Structure formats: structure tokens, C-alpha cells
Swiss-Prot record:
Alphabetical UniProt keywords: Signal
The name this protein goes by in its record: Uncharacterized protein OsI_031781
InterPro entries: Pollen_allergen/Os (IPR035506)
Additional record remark: On the 2D-gel the determined pI of this unknown protein is: 7.1, its MW is: 19 kDa.
Signal peptide start and end residues: 1-16
């Protein structure tokens, strides 16, 4: 229970850092995703790919290790979201970062269930290194 609460608090803290809120800005009633800038679309696609990969790793985990795997995937997920957040403002960095994490997520999704956790750990580390180098 304490782990779950700690994970939830860590996720909330990380999302508070990553989410930008505009105060007193008029909200468009008919929001059209087709009007999103290419950069925003890349970030959305990368975020979705990261979440799908992490969810598949947790789903493939054996019941005895589910809590441990979930904690580790949250850690990788938060690092990935932080990297995406740090890339904002530079279109080339956004492109490199989103591509690196989409490749890593695809590798995890294509992996056998027994290999998903190890592959996520390794491929997300490689993606993070690609981001640092770019």
C-alpha cells in the first residue's frame, strides 16, 4: 500500500512538472486535433507509445513481481516524459527525442512477454542516451 501511494505521489509530482497550464486563456470550444502543430503531434504520439509500452510490460509481468515491475516502469516512464518535456522548444530535439522513444516503445511492444521488462529497461536507456547526444 505504501509503495502504491509513493508511486502515485511520484507520478503526480512528475506530471505537475511536465504539465504547463495557461491561466486566463480562452478555451476553444471546438478543439481540433488536426490543428495541432507537428511538434505537438510528435509529442502526443511519443507519449502514447511510451504509455502503451509501459502498460504492456506491466501486463506481461508475473503476479509475484507485478508491484516491482510497475514501480520500475513508472520510473522509466517519468524519465521519458521528462526528456520529452526538456526537448520542447527545439523542433530538432523534439523530433530526435520522440523518434528515439517511439522506436524503443515499438521494440518493447514487439517483444515476447518474458522479454518485455528487460527490453524496456535497455531500450529506454538507449533512447535516453540518444537524447543526451543529440
Amino acid at each position: 500500500m505504501a509503495k502504491a501511494v509513493a508511486l502515485l505521489l511520484a507520478a503526480i509530482a512528475a506530471s505537475a512538472v511536465l504539465v504547463q497550464v495557461e491561466c486566463d486563456a480562452p478555451v476553444e470550444k471546438s478543439f481540433n486535433k488536426a490543428l495541432l502543430a507537428p511538434v505537438d503531434k510528435r509529442l502526443d504520439e511519443a507519449t502514447q507509445a511510451i504509455n502503451e509500452a509501459a502498460d504492456s510490460v506491466v501486463a506481461a509481468a508475473p503476479p509475484a513481481k507485478k508491484d516491482e515491475v510497475e514501480a520500475a516502469t513508472w520510473k522509466r516512464r517519468m524519465f521519458a516524459f521528462a526528456a520529452l518535456g526538456m526537448a520542447q522548444g527545439d523542433e530538432k530535439k523534439v523530433a530526435a527525442t520522440s523518434l528515439a522513444y517511439k522506436k524503443a516503445a515499438k521494440a518493447v511492444l514487439d517483444a515476447a512477454p518474458a522479454d518485455k521488462f528487460k527490453l524496456m529497461d535497455e531500450s529506454f536507456k538507449v533512447a535516453a542516451m540518444e537524447v543526451i547526444v543529440s
